[in-house]
Amino acid sequence: AFAPDHCKNNPAKRQAWAVDQVQKAAIASQKLGLSTSVSFTGSLAFPYLYPWPQRPDGLIEEAFEELGRRWRPILDHYKDRGVSIGFEIHPGEDVFDGATYEMFVNATGNHDCALINYDPSHFLLQQMDYLAFIDLYHDRINAFHVKDAEFNPDGRQGVYSGYQSWVNRAGRFRSLGDGQVDFAGIFSKLTQYGYDSWAVLEWECCIKSAEQGAAEGAPFIESHLIEPPKSAFDDFAGGDRDDAAISAMLGLSGRKP
């Protein structure tokens, strides 16, 4: 849908065009003074996520090996320009959770530019622990889509949402503050681990207008930004190391410091 006409119905030309566009994004990022960009991994294996008959042995492994072969030279191109890629963990792409991200990173040779664009909305709709995800992968997160969602299963539908319209789905995206995502917990976790990059409003709500979502969303994000303390609250009561005092406190006064 995005490719120019001369690439349509020609997979090889379309892929070459796409690689060129992604590489140009690295050059543009460098010229703009940006060190972070975002992308998707692409989908080779996702059509076989839940197959019947069962998929043949080696299918998933080969899909990820091919993803690695395609992405390694692109990631090298980004690294040469001082730019990293935050891959959005997103259903429909081959990388849609922590396990598949690990498979992808392994396929790239643990490339240090293959990072994560963290979007909790997709984790909530999969019923993942999106706070524990930060504990596991905080050192790989270089971008953050601040996007809300809610999941309200019932007797008729669950995670797959029964092909219903967005308004009628059990899982749906919401404007910031209207869903179920614990943003206070997320901003606290990211601050705890020293995150210092983007917090970008993403709006895809089926209930509230984009204009209202943007007007409310920007101050919502601002209200969640955390300024880390410059010192611990009880530092005033501490002091320099005093071996004699330590020995006395531990009842070791007869021992030489």
Could you describe each region identified by the protein language model?
Residues 2-115, 235, 250-255:
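Active-site acidic/histidine proton-transfer and metal-coordination neighborhood
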Residues 20-36, 72, 129-142, 184-192:
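Short amphipathic alpha-helices and their capping/turn segments at secondary-structure boundaries
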Residues 37, 144, 198-199:
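Hydrophobic residues within beta-strands of alpha/beta enzymes
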Residues 42, 149, 203-204:
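Flexible loop residues that form catalytic
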Residues 62-64, 68-180, 229-233, 242:
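Acidic/histidine-rich catalytic cores of soluble enzymes
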Residues 200-210, 238:
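A short, acidic, flexible beta-alpha connecting loop/helix-capping segment that sits on the rim
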Residues 210-230:
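C-terminal helical cap(s) of enzyme catalytic domains, especially alpha/beta-barrels
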Residues 226-257:
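Terminal-tail/helix-coil boundary detector
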